[in-house]
Amino acid sequence: VTSTNDAVYAATSLGAFRVSLEDNSITRINKANNLSDVGISCLQGIPERDMLLVGYDNGNLDIMIGNKFINLSDIKESALIAAKKINSIYVKDDFAFLCTEFGIVQLDLVRLEIKDTYLIGENGAYVNVFDLEIADGRILVATDR
């Protein structure tokens, strides 16, 4: 569950529900009417940008800005030989950090493009990253190791 300026969103494996904060109306959002995929793994609202990020089990990412949907399939289509699920999304300033089953992907929220990928295991090995937090200039990462 997450929120933007005008709505609260909840995810299911086949789509999401949007509850309007203005009139409490409920709208179903799915592959048939806006989303690019099924298998939602996480949602992250960014109220100050009127933006919603939708991460998927296969690494796909939808970005909703207002009522416009943009698909960013770079992770899904990458040649990485690893599971690509987006576990969670952390937002800091102009960037979103996608915590994935192989590491961390930094998304530029202004340019709407991948800025960098961090393989944080020993010698660049894949590490399943569940979540992260940035505090006091440090990145704290929750992994399976």
What are the functions of these language-model segments?
Residues 11-31:
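Beta-propeller domains
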Residues 1-4, 29-48, 72-92, 116-136:
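Short coil-to-beta transitions that initiate beta-strands within beta-rich domains
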Residues 1-15:
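Beta-strand-rich domains and repeat architectures in extracellular enzymes and scaffolds
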Residues 8-9, 17, 50, 60:
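Primarily extracytoplasmic ectodomains and periplasmic/lumenal surface modules that are beta-strand-rich
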Residues 54-56, 60-75:
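Surface-exposed, polar helix/loop patches in the mature regions of secreted/periplasmic/lumenal proteins
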Residues 20-24, 65-68, 108-112:
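Short loop/turn segments that connect beta-strands within beta-propeller blades
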Residues 14-17, 57-61, 102-105, 144-145:
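Loop/turn residues immediately N-terminal
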Residues 7-10, 51-54, 95-98, 138-141:
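Conserved beta-propeller blade signature
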